Amino acid sequence: MKSVLVALATATAVSAHGWVDNITISGQFYQVPLHSLDHENLPYQDPYMGEWAPKRISRKIITNGPVEDVTSIDLQCGGSTIEGQIGSEPAPLHAKAVAGSEVSLRWTHWPDSHMGPVLTYMARCPDSGCDKFLPGDEPIWFKIHHEGRHTFDKTWPDDIWATVSIAQHHITSILSFLTLEQTPFMKFDNEPYRYTIPECLKPGFYLVRHEIIALHSAWAAKGAQFYPSCHQLEVSGSGSVVPSASNAELVGFPGAYDAEDPSILFQVWAPGPYNIPGPAVFECPAQ
């Protein structure tokens, strides 16, 4: 019965993946992209065209579907090489933010079945800004936050991941009696995901890479699904640290993950611990 319900939920959710709809930084609200009451209006279909298109702090994504190849440059920010958007096209604006402050990202719906970790990375851009910066696969990214499996000592229906329960109502009705528990964020009351900009960072321009890794099909090779997106910050503050190979674990995208990594090739429906992929979370040096 459980496998039938999971299959139903997964099939129904194929066209119902979520994305970051808006970001709040230093009290300023940023639409990512423009909100629309038209449910067919996916994030890559901004209704404003030409000279009327509003400028963004977020880099464009081509589709609300996943990146499934860990060796693809599209893993970086959700671009689509096939569509001519390598990695992801830089945004024209930067959001002003203070080191040590909290940033809130509000997702749209998210399928209950698509359980997995949520991770956030940063990379320092050139002194001229991020608006023309394409990192390639250089190891410049440092992880600032991650969440994975919150519990693993319960039976499957009570399993708690960082992505459970932002599902649409029709998915919820299928799974409701399985009592999938809600997580600290991504709830039906649309609690945002939050990360904190490291307080020690040297002022400058930074690219933030935020992602969900959905593991519902990850028992098979290339079954993991990656949902990355990027936004651009201009960080101020009194910090002086520039993360480098001497004080942080830096990775590239692609390059940070391996398809055979036990955290990528993983049976999410089985109980047991889960080690979040990628480097250790960067910590500011002790004062």
Swiss-Prot record:
Enzyme Commission numbers on file: 1.14.99.56
GO CC list: extracellular region
One Pfam assignment: AA9
EC primary class: oxidoreductase
Membrane-spanning intervals of the chain: none
Coiled coil: none
Top-level taxonomic group: Eukaryota
UniProt keywords, alphabetically: Carbohydrate metabolism, Cellulose degradation, Copper, Disulfide bond, Glycoprotein, Metal-binding, Monooxygenase, Oxidoreductase, Polysaccharide degradation, Secreted, Signal
Binding site for Cu(2+): 17, 114, 227
Any single GO BP term: cellulose catabolic process
Cofactor: Cu(2+)
Cofactor note: Binds 1 copper ion per subunit.
Gene Ontology MF terms: metal ion binding; monooxygenase activity
Subcellular location, principal: secreted
Secretion signal, residue range per the UniProt entry: 1-16
Reaction(s) catalysed (UniProt annotation): [(1->4)-beta-D-glucosyl]n+m + reduced acceptor + O2 = 4-dehydro-beta-D-glucosyl-[(1->4)-beta-D-glucosyl]n-1 + [(1->4)-beta-D-glucosyl]m + acceptor + H2O
InterPro entries, A to Z: AA9, AA9_LPMO
Residues of this chain annotated as glycosylated in UniProt: 22
Application of this enzyme or protein: Lignocellulose is the most abundant polymeric composite on Earth and is a recalcitrant but promising renewable substrate for industrial biotechnology applications. Together with cellobiose dehydrogenases (CDHs) an enzymatic system capable of oxidative cellulose cleavage is formed, which increases the efficiency of cellulases and put LPMOs at focus of biofuel research.
Function in brief: Lytic polysaccharide monooxygenase (LPMO) that depolymerizes crystalline and amorphous polysaccharides via the oxidation of scissile alpha- or beta-(1-4)-glycosidic bonds, yielding C1 or C4 oxidation products. Catalysis by LPMOs requires the reduction of the active-site copper from Cu(II) to Cu(I) by a reducing agent and H(2)O(2) or O(2) as a cosubstrate.
Protein name per UniProt: AA9 family lytic polysaccharide monooxygenase C
